[in-house]
Protein backbone atom coordinates (compact mmCIF):
# COMPACT_ATOMS: atom_id res chain seq x y z
CA UNK A 1 0.00 0.00 0.00
CA UNK A 2 2.80 2.40 0.84
CA UNK A 3 3.93 4.22 -2.27
CA UNK A 4 6.31 7.18 -2.37
CA UNK A 5 5.76 9.70 -5.15
CA UNK A 6 9.22 10.91 -6.09
CA UNK A 7 7.74 13.97 -7.83
CA UNK A 8 6.28 15.30 -4.58
CA UNK A 9 7.93 18.51 -3.37
CA UNK A 10 7.05 18.51 0.30
CA UNK A 11 7.49 21.68 2.31
CA UNK A 12 9.45 21.67 5.56
CA UNK A 13 6.71 21.42 8.19
CA UNK A 14 8.12 23.70 10.89
CA UNK A 15 5.48 25.54 12.89
CA UNK A 16 5.51 28.70 10.78
CA UNK A 17 5.35 27.13 7.34
CA UNK A 18 2.96 24.42 8.48
CA UNK A 19 0.48 26.84 10.04
CA UNK A 20 0.57 29.13 7.02
CA UNK A 21 0.20 26.28 4.57
CA UNK A 22 -2.76 24.82 6.42
CA UNK A 23 -4.46 28.21 6.55
CA UNK A 24 -4.01 28.57 2.79
CA UNK A 25 -6.32 25.57 2.40
CA UNK A 26 -9.12 27.86 3.55
CA UNK A 27 -8.54 30.07 0.51
CA UNK A 28 -9.13 27.10 -1.77
CA UNK A 29 -12.52 26.56 -0.15
CA UNK A 30 -13.42 30.24 -0.01
CA UNK A 31 -16.43 31.03 -2.20
CA UNK A 32 -18.25 27.73 -2.64
CA UNK A 33 -17.97 26.96 1.08
CA UNK A 34 -19.10 29.25 3.90
CA UNK A 35 -16.32 30.33 6.25
CA UNK A 36 -18.14 28.72 9.18
CA UNK A 37 -17.81 25.35 7.43
CA UNK A 38 -14.09 25.50 6.60
CA UNK A 39 -13.22 23.43 9.67
CA UNK A 40 -15.69 20.73 8.64
CA UNK A 41 -13.52 19.90 5.63
CA UNK A 42 -9.98 21.01 6.47
CA UNK A 43 -9.59 19.18 9.78
CA UNK A 44 -10.67 15.76 8.43
CA UNK A 45 -8.34 16.15 5.43
CA UNK A 46 -5.44 17.04 7.71
CA UNK A 47 -6.12 14.03 9.91
CA UNK A 48 -6.52 11.72 6.89
CA UNK A 49 -3.15 12.87 5.55
CA UNK A 50 -1.49 12.41 8.95
CA UNK A 51 -2.87 8.87 9.30
CA UNK A 52 -1.66 7.93 5.83
CA UNK A 53 1.83 9.38 6.26
CA UNK A 54 2.32 7.71 9.64
CA UNK A 55 1.09 4.43 8.16
CA UNK A 56 3.73 4.75 5.44
CA UNK A 57 6.45 5.26 8.05
CA UNK A 58 5.31 2.22 10.01
CA UNK A 59 5.16 0.20 6.80
CA UNK A 60 8.73 1.20 5.87
CA UNK A 61 10.05 0.23 9.32
CA UNK A 62 8.31 -3.15 9.23
CA UNK A 63 9.55 -3.72 5.69
CA UNK A 64 13.14 -3.10 6.73
CA UNK A 65 12.87 -5.26 9.84
CA UNK A 66 11.39 -8.17 7.87
CA UNK A 67 13.78 -8.10 4.94
CA UNK A 68 11.28 -6.61 2.49
CA UNK A 69 8.38 -8.89 3.45
CA UNK A 70 5.45 -6.80 2.18
CA UNK A 71 2.84 -9.11 3.66
CA UNK A 72 4.42 -8.79 7.09
CA UNK A 73 4.65 -5.00 6.73
CA UNK A 74 0.86 -4.82 6.39
CA UNK A 75 0.12 -6.85 9.54
CA UNK A 76 -2.14 -4.88 11.93
CA UNK A 77 0.40 -5.35 14.72
CA UNK A 78 2.78 -3.04 12.87
CA UNK A 79 0.36 -0.10 12.75
CA UNK A 80 -1.38 2.02 15.35
CA UNK A 81 -4.30 2.58 12.99
CA UNK A 82 -5.46 0.39 10.13
CA UNK A 83 -5.94 1.76 6.61
CA UNK A 84 -7.90 -0.69 4.43
CA UNK A 85 -6.79 -1.47 0.91
CA UNK A 86 -7.73 1.32 -1.48
CA UNK A 87 -8.37 3.83 1.32
CA UNK A 88 -4.93 5.46 1.62
CA UNK A 89 -4.47 9.16 0.85
CA UNK A 90 -2.55 8.27 -2.31
CA UNK A 91 -5.42 6.07 -3.52
CA UNK A 92 -7.83 9.00 -3.33
CA UNK A 93 -5.27 11.38 -4.79
CA UNK A 94 -5.09 9.28 -7.95
CA UNK A 95 -8.79 9.89 -8.66
CA UNK A 96 -9.74 12.47 -11.26
CA UNK A 97 -13.53 12.10 -11.04
CA UNK A 98 -15.96 11.59 -8.15
CA UNK A 99 -13.23 12.56 -5.71
CA UNK A 100 -15.73 13.44 -3.01
CA UNK A 101 -17.20 9.96 -3.15
CA UNK A 102 -13.72 8.43 -2.92
CA UNK A 103 -12.88 10.62 0.08
CA UNK A 104 -16.08 9.80 1.89
CA UNK A 105 -15.66 6.07 1.25
CA UNK A 106 -12.04 6.08 2.42
CA UNK A 107 -12.86 7.95 5.62
CA UNK A 108 -15.81 5.71 6.48
CA UNK A 109 -13.78 2.56 5.81
CA UNK A 110 -10.96 3.81 8.05
CA UNK A 111 -13.48 4.51 10.81
CA UNK A 112 -14.93 1.02 10.43
CA UNK A 113 -11.46 -0.56 10.47
CA UNK A 114 -10.68 1.20 13.78
CA UNK A 115 -14.01 1.06 15.65
CA UNK A 116 -12.59 1.45 19.15
CA UNK A 117 -10.57 4.58 18.39
CA UNK A 118 -11.75 6.32 15.21
CA UNK A 119 -15.49 5.67 15.03
CA UNK A 120 -17.16 8.82 13.66
CA UNK A 121 -13.98 10.89 13.90
CA UNK A 122 -14.20 12.32 10.37
CA UNK A 123 -17.57 13.91 11.11
CA UNK A 124 -20.50 14.25 8.74
CA UNK A 125 -19.16 16.53 5.99
CA UNK A 126 -21.01 16.18 2.68
CA UNK A 127 -18.05 15.34 0.47
CA UNK A 128 -20.26 14.22 -2.43
CA UNK A 129 -22.04 17.58 -2.82
CA UNK A 130 -20.57 18.69 -6.16
CA UNK A 131 -22.39 22.02 -6.06
CA UNK A 132 -20.18 22.90 -3.13
CA UNK A 133 -17.17 20.64 -3.70
CA UNK A 134 -16.41 20.16 -7.37
CA UNK A 135 -13.84 17.62 -8.51
CA UNK A 136 -11.55 20.49 -9.51
CA UNK A 137 -11.77 22.09 -6.06
CA UNK A 138 -11.15 18.81 -4.25
CA UNK A 139 -8.25 18.03 -6.56
CA UNK A 140 -6.68 21.40 -5.71
CA UNK A 141 -7.24 20.73 -2.02
CA UNK A 142 -5.72 17.25 -2.20
CA UNK A 143 -2.68 18.53 -4.08
CA UNK A 144 -2.27 21.35 -1.56
CA UNK A 145 -2.18 18.91 1.36
CA UNK A 146 0.02 16.50 -0.60
CA UNK A 147 2.83 19.06 -0.43
CA UNK A 148 2.97 18.41 3.32
CA UNK A 149 4.93 15.54 4.80
CA UNK A 150 3.01 14.77 7.98
CA UNK A 151 4.69 11.63 9.23
CA UNK A 152 6.27 11.55 12.69
CA UNK A 153 9.77 11.79 11.26
CA UNK A 154 9.11 15.06 9.42
CA UNK A 155 6.38 16.51 11.62
CA UNK A 156 6.55 15.84 15.34
CA UNK A 157 3.33 15.67 17.31
CA UNK A 158 4.03 18.91 19.19
CA UNK A 159 4.58 20.85 15.94
CA UNK A 160 1.49 19.40 14.29
CA UNK A 161 -0.52 19.97 17.45
CA UNK A 162 0.49 23.64 17.60
CA UNK A 163 -0.45 24.12 13.96
CA UNK A 164 -3.78 22.44 14.62
CA UNK A 165 -4.49 24.77 17.53
CA UNK A 166 -3.51 27.70 15.32
CA UNK A 167 -6.21 26.63 12.88
CA UNK A 168 -8.76 26.23 15.66
CA UNK A 169 -8.13 29.81 16.78
CA UNK A 170 -8.19 31.15 13.22
CA UNK A 171 -11.51 29.48 12.53
CA UNK A 172 -12.90 30.77 15.83
CA UNK A 173 -11.78 34.31 14.96
CA UNK A 174 -13.19 33.97 11.45
CA UNK A 175 -16.66 33.10 12.67
CA UNK A 176 -16.60 35.17 15.90
CA UNK A 177 -17.05 32.05 18.03
CA UNK A 178 -14.94 32.91 21.02
CA UNK A 179 -17.31 32.78 23.96
CA UNK A 180 -16.68 29.18 24.89
CA UNK A 181 -18.88 27.79 22.12
CA UNK A 182 -15.93 26.70 20.02
CA UNK A 183 -12.70 28.13 21.41
CA UNK A 184 -11.43 29.36 24.77
CA UNK A 185 -8.33 31.61 24.63
CA UNK A 186 -5.14 29.71 25.42
CA UNK A 187 -4.15 32.12 28.20
CA UNK A 188 -7.47 31.53 29.98
CA UNK A 189 -7.11 27.78 29.63
CA UNK A 190 -3.55 27.86 30.99
CA UNK A 191 -4.65 29.89 34.03
CA UNK A 192 -7.53 27.52 34.79
CA UNK A 193 -5.26 24.49 34.59
CA UNK A 194 -2.67 26.09 36.88
CA UNK A 195 -5.41 26.73 39.42
CA UNK A 196 -6.67 23.15 39.06
CA UNK A 197 -3.10 21.77 39.36
CA UNK A 198 -3.83 18.20 38.24
CA UNK A 199 -1.40 15.49 39.30
CA UNK A 200 -0.14 12.44 37.43
CA UNK A 201 -2.60 9.56 37.59
CA UNK A 202 -5.64 11.69 38.38
CA UNK A 203 -8.72 11.51 36.18
CA UNK A 204 -9.64 14.78 34.48
CA UNK A 205 -13.10 15.54 33.11
CA UNK A 206 -14.35 18.37 30.91
CA UNK A 207 -18.17 18.13 30.54
CA UNK A 208 -18.19 20.83 27.85
CA UNK A 209 -14.88 20.00 26.21
CA UNK A 210 -15.26 21.85 22.90
CA UNK A 211 -12.14 21.19 20.85
CA UNK A 212 -10.29 19.57 23.76
CA UNK A 213 -8.02 22.47 24.65
CA UNK A 214 -8.45 22.19 28.42
CA UNK A 215 -7.77 18.46 28.47
CA UNK A 216 -4.65 19.00 26.38
CA UNK A 217 -3.41 21.81 28.62
CA UNK A 218 -3.96 19.57 31.65
CA UNK A 219 -1.93 16.85 29.94
CA UNK A 220 0.88 19.33 29.20
CA UNK A 221 0.78 20.56 32.80
CA UNK A 222 1.21 17.05 34.18
CA UNK A 223 4.09 16.36 31.80
CA UNK A 224 5.79 19.64 32.73
CA UNK A 225 5.50 19.08 36.47
CA UNK A 226 5.90 15.30 36.68
CA UNK A 227 8.13 14.73 33.67
CA UNK A 228 6.03 11.90 32.25
CA UNK A 229 2.49 11.87 30.92
CA UNK A 230 2.26 8.06 30.63
CA UNK A 231 0.39 7.95 33.93
CA UNK A 232 -2.37 9.93 32.19
CA UNK A 233 -3.21 7.11 29.78
CA UNK A 234 -6.96 6.56 29.99
CA UNK A 235 -7.35 9.44 32.46
CA UNK A 236 -8.78 12.15 30.16
CA UNK A 237 -12.56 12.38 29.75
CA UNK A 238 -14.66 14.85 27.82
CA UNK A 239 -18.15 15.29 26.45
CA UNK A 240 -19.23 17.67 23.69
CA UNK A 241 -22.70 18.17 22.23
CA UNK A 242 -21.72 19.35 18.74
CA UNK A 243 -20.78 16.56 16.32
CA UNK A 244 -18.17 18.50 14.36
CA UNK A 245 -16.59 19.99 17.49
CA UNK A 246 -16.39 16.63 19.27
CA UNK A 247 -14.65 15.16 16.22
CA UNK A 248 -12.21 18.09 16.21
CA UNK A 249 -11.47 17.44 19.89
CA UNK A 250 -10.59 13.80 19.23
CA UNK A 251 -8.40 14.72 16.25
CA UNK A 252 -6.77 17.44 18.36
CA UNK A 253 -5.79 14.97 21.07
CA UNK A 254 -4.53 12.39 18.59
CA UNK A 255 -2.48 14.96 16.67
CA UNK A 256 -0.88 16.13 19.92
CA UNK A 257 0.26 12.56 20.56
CA UNK A 258 -2.30 11.62 23.23
CA UNK A 259 -2.67 7.85 23.14
CA UNK A 260 -5.65 6.94 25.31
CA UNK A 261 -8.59 9.20 26.13
CA UNK A 262 -12.37 9.23 26.18
CA UNK A 263 -14.29 11.86 24.22
CA UNK A 264 -18.02 11.26 23.80
CA UNK A 265 -20.59 13.25 21.88
CA UNK A 266 -23.77 14.25 23.63
CA UNK A 267 -25.50 16.72 25.93
CA UNK A 268 -23.87 16.53 29.36
CA UNK A 269 -26.98 17.77 31.17
CA UNK A 270 -29.56 15.67 29.32
CA UNK A 271 -27.53 12.56 28.47
CA UNK A 272 -24.31 12.23 30.50
CA UNK A 273 -21.96 9.73 28.89
CA UNK A 274 -19.83 8.37 31.73
CA UNK A 275 -21.07 5.93 34.36
CA UNK A 276 -19.80 3.82 37.21
CA UNK A 277 -22.27 1.00 37.57
CA UNK A 278 -25.74 2.54 37.84
CA UNK A 279 -24.41 5.90 38.99
CA UNK A 280 -22.65 8.71 37.21
CA UNK A 281 -18.88 8.43 37.15
CA UNK A 282 -16.88 10.72 39.41
CA UNK A 283 -13.50 12.27 38.62
CA UNK A 284 -10.52 13.64 40.51
CA UNK A 285 -10.51 16.91 38.56
CA UNK A 286 -13.23 18.74 36.66
CA UNK A 287 -12.57 21.73 34.42
CA UNK A 288 -14.77 23.49 31.85
CA UNK A 289 -15.92 26.68 30.19
CA UNK A 290 -19.65 25.83 30.07
CA UNK A 291 -22.05 27.32 27.50
CA UNK A 292 -23.75 29.68 29.96
CA UNK A 293 -25.45 31.58 27.12
CA UNK A 294 -27.35 28.47 25.99
CA UNK A 295 -31.09 29.14 26.01
CA UNK A 296 -32.75 25.71 25.66
CA UNK A 297 -30.50 23.82 28.04
CA UNK A 298 -32.96 21.19 29.33
CA UNK A 299 -34.72 22.62 32.38
CA UNK A 300 -37.56 20.14 31.90
CA UNK A 301 -35.15 17.23 32.31
CA UNK A 302 -33.39 18.75 35.31
CA UNK A 303 -36.58 19.14 37.33
CA UNK A 304 -36.75 15.35 37.58
CA UNK A 305 -33.09 14.50 37.09
CA UNK A 306 -32.70 10.73 37.66
CA UNK A 307 -29.15 11.15 38.96
CA UNK A 308 -29.97 13.59 41.74
CA UNK A 309 -27.78 16.35 40.38
CA UNK A 310 -30.32 18.99 41.45
CA UNK A 311 -30.55 17.85 45.05
CA UNK A 312 -28.81 21.00 46.27
CA UNK A 313 -30.46 23.40 43.84
CA UNK A 314 -33.86 25.02 44.19
CA UNK A 315 -36.05 24.82 41.10
CA UNK A 316 -35.95 28.57 40.53
CA UNK A 317 -32.15 28.79 40.39
CA UNK A 318 -30.41 29.74 37.16
CA UNK A 319 -28.83 27.14 34.90
CA UNK A 320 -25.43 28.37 36.10
CA UNK A 321 -26.08 26.72 39.43
CA UNK A 322 -27.36 23.56 37.77
CA UNK A 323 -24.27 23.30 35.62
CA UNK A 324 -22.15 23.79 38.72
CA UNK A 325 -24.02 21.04 40.53
CA UNK A 326 -23.31 18.75 37.56
CA UNK A 327 -19.59 19.34 38.20
CA UNK A 328 -19.79 18.76 41.95
CA UNK A 329 -21.75 15.51 42.03
Q: Whereabouts are the PLM-identified features?
A:
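Conserved S-adenosyl-L-methionine
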Residues: 178-288, 292-304
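Short, solvent-exposed loop/helix junctions and linker helices
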Residues: 35, 135, 280, 326-327
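Generic hydrophobic, helix-prone segments enriched in Leu/Val/Ile
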Residues: 106-110, 231, 237, 321-322
Amino acid sequence: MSRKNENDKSIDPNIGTLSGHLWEAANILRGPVDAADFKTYIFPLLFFKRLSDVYDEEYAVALEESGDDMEFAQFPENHRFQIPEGCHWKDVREKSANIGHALQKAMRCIEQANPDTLHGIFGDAQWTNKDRLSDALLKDLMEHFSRLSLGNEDCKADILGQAYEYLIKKFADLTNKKAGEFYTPRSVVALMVRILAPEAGETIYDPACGTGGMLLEALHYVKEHDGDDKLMLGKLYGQEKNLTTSSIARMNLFLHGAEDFHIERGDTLRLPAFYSGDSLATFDCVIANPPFSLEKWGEDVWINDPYGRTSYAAEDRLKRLLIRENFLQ
